[in-house]
């Protein structure tokens, strides 16, 4: 019967996997990785919070697609949290961690990836439902969208917890991987292959939908300009989604390939030398998504810009002396109109700075 090592610290497993964490995380490389990672995380928290707030405040975004887009932003926000936790529990500190704390560290990263991937799959279903009917938005109810979002997070949390639940190498040291010293190589193979397979499926689905919409758009009569403009609207959303999917595949595939090579026990692949740079590349995906949303969607860009504008103006107003009562009274007369605009179009900034 194999001996289990639940009470060991991580230095026991790192030493057996010949992973010298202390030497790798010193000097210039450590400073670069931590500085870039910190900047990425701050931007992730700020930009993805803006995306979520934009969807909440702007009625134009109160549709299934944008609710799912906000959930993808929430997954990116969670990825930032996971990376912050990683930065405080990595390098020389890694060897001092308990098994449970290391499981938590890695589980957060696995959960963030699964949440993003599952959310993209749900968006693919939503886009398929709407575009096959040549509609901008699907007829999913808010209740169904909420259930789908809950399902995404339930799957993500479960997948992140699978190694903790038993699929690990604590009782079979010879099966341990190198990059994840208490993950069994069989689990790494399963996890990476399933994710890569999901990538290929999503790419195939989106390419099929894209070609379908393009074919339908090209056969429309040139005399029905109104119909053309309505039918091209789904294509705009599709281009946004495909750009997001492309960025996701580019940023995550190298890291997954490295994990797969480690799972296959490739001794000559030198996976230890590239793992942190590929992790930064994966984190870059959460940085890129809000930029893609705002660049591809003019309404999203305008809403986010107005929110920043309003926040800056509110900050400046607090530093200024109060205005005279007549000015305040004249502004209050238009208050209801501003309120109405803010509900229908998102935050409204007053150009006069009041």
From Swiss-Prot:
Matching SUPFAM superfamilies: Family A G protein-coupled receptor-like (SSF81321)
Function: Receptor for lysophosphatidic acid (LPA), a mediator of diverse cellular activities. Seems to be coupled to the G(i)/G(o) and G(q) families of heteromeric G proteins.
Record keyword Glycoprotein present: yes
Family per similarity comment: Belongs to the G-protein coupled receptor 1 family.
Glycosylation sites: 15, 172
Signal peptide bounds: none
Regions crossing the membrane: 32-52, 68-88, 102-124, 147-167, 187-207, 241-261, 277-295
GO CC, alphabetical: axon; cilium; plasma membrane
Pfam entry (one): 7tm_1
Amino acid composition bias (Polar residues), ranges on this chain: 323-354
Tissue spec: Most abundantly expressed in testes, kidney, and lung, with moderate levels in small intestine, and low levels in heart, stomach, spleen, and adult and perinatal brain. Little or no expression in embryonic brain, liver, or thymus.
Region Disordered: start-end pairs: 315-354
GO MF annotation list: G-protein alpha-subunit binding; lysophosphatidic acid receptor activity; phospholipid binding
Residues in compartment: Extracellular: 1-31, 89-101, 168-186, 262-276
Gene Ontology BP terms: bleb assembly; collateral sprouting; G protein-coupled receptor signaling pathway; gene expression; positive regulation of calcium ion transport; positive regulation of collateral sprouting; positive regulation of MAPK cascade
Cytoplasmic side: 53-67, 125-146, 208-240, 296-354
Identification of the protein by name: Lysophosphatidic acid receptor 3
CDD domains in alphabetical order: 7tmA_LPAR3_Edg7
Major localisation: membrane
UniProt membrane topology term: Multi-pass membrane protein
Keyword Endoplasmic reticulum (UniProt): no
Lipidation (S-palmitoyl cysteine): 309
This protein's encoding gene: Lpar3
Locations listed in the record: Cell membrane
